[in-house]
């Protein structure tokens, strides 16, 4: 249509971006953590598309998604839904690989599920990413993080 793309959105058509936006428009996920995990656990939206035209589009979605994920993480942690917390934290790491709050909740949740070795692995992966990004060591020890939330 005049040199532009046009996609007709019908009931048979599923778009994870639109489903995610719909959840975000509710202002929170309304307890739809499982649906949100299913969408964002695949990684960044349009990650394989390297076109500057989409950069602000992707950035805006991530900016809206991050606080919603943090709220869901906190809510699920209070409900002791630790597996969901870990999955949400992993999803948040796609957006912000050095999100300190997500690390704390992931470590706490894994520890509460008696998965201390997995928690240590998570901490080490985070520390490496932090060093690569910030060019300095992560300032908190594993023990500090276990006590932080």
Feature map (PLM): residue ranges:
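Intrinsically disordered, charged and Pro/Gly-enriched terminal/linker segments
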Residues: 2-149
């Amino acid at each position: 249509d005049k040199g532009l793309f046009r996609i007709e959105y019908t009931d048979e058509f599923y778009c994870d971006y639109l489903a995610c936006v719909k959840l975000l428009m509710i202002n929170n996920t309304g307890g739809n953590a499982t649906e949100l995990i299913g969408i964002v656990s695949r990684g960044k939206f349009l990650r394989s598309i390297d076109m500057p035209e989409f950069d602000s589009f992707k950035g805006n979605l991530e900016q809206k998604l991050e606080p919603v994920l943090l709220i869901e993480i906190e809510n699920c942690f209070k409900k002791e839904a630790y597996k969901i917390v870990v999955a949400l934290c992993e999803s948040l790491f796609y957006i912000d690989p050095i999100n300190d709050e997500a690390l704390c909740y992931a470590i706490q949740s894994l520890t509460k599920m008696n998965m201390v070795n997995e928690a240590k692995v998570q901490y080490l992966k985070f520390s490496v990413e932090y060093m690569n990004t910030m060019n300095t060591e992560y300032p908190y020890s594993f023990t500090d993080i276990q006590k932080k939330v």
